[in-house]
């Protein structure tokens, strides 16, 4: 499967048939994702999540054991949400440019729905120079996402929407750079013309690979 699809054990945790404890943990992860989106993943702690969710600090510690484990669980939960909201729906769209456009629209919608925007963007800035397990998880997720962009470019070649000699690594770089630029203009600069500029840049990008 493509990027961000969790393994069988992880998927079973987040879906149906959860125990009361697992349901509580899911509630905490949802609150943690929202907090990480607004304040940054580094600001999410067992203590402040306990206050936000009105749960005991000792109860949350029993679930996560450490701040690092909590942050990793939030990243895994975010990855599952990203897969369900962005990647899987796009893969159900016609291969080629329609699929690329669906992926971009889904990414933008998913980022809109998070108060502070894409958690992977903010977490990458926070942890890029901080070795450790959280960075390792984030790095793996981002590499899978970039590989997903490569694969979608390859599928566009296969259906004839892109020319045969494209560099799919360059395409992944170009498309992700476009999305990161969109995120900056929309979230920080609050530019009303962001979506218009994004569409213009996307058309130019797609045309360059035809």
Where are these regions (language model features)?
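Basic, helix-initiating cap at the start of DNA-binding domains
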Residues: 1-39, 43-55, 69
């Amino acid at each position: 499967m493509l990027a961000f699809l969790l393994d069988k054990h992880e998927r079973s945790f987040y879906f149906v048939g959860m125990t009361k404890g697992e349901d509580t943990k899911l509630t905490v992860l949802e609150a943690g994702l929202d907090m990480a989106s607004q304040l940054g993943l580094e600001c999410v702690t067992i203590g402040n999540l306990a206050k936000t969710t009105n749960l005991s600090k000792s109860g949350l510690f029993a679930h996560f054991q450490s701040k690092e484990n909590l942050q990793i669980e939030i990243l895994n939960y975010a990855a599952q949400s990203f897969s369900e909201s962005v990647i899987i729906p796009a893969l159900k769209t016609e291969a080629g440019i329609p699929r690329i456009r669906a992926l971009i629209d889904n990414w933008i919608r998913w980022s809109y729905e998070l108060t502070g925007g894409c958690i992977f963007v903010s977490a990458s800035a926070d942890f890029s120079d901080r070795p450790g397990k959280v960075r390792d998880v984030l790095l793996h997720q981002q590499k899978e996402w970039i590989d997903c962009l490569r694969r979608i470019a390859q599928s566009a070649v296969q259906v004839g929407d892109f020319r045969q000699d494209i560099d799919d690594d360059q395409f992944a770089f170009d498309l992700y750079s476009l999305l990161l630029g969109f995120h900056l203009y929309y979230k920080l600069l609050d530019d009303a013309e962001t979506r218009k500029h994004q569409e213009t840049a996307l058309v130019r990008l797609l045309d360059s690979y035809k």
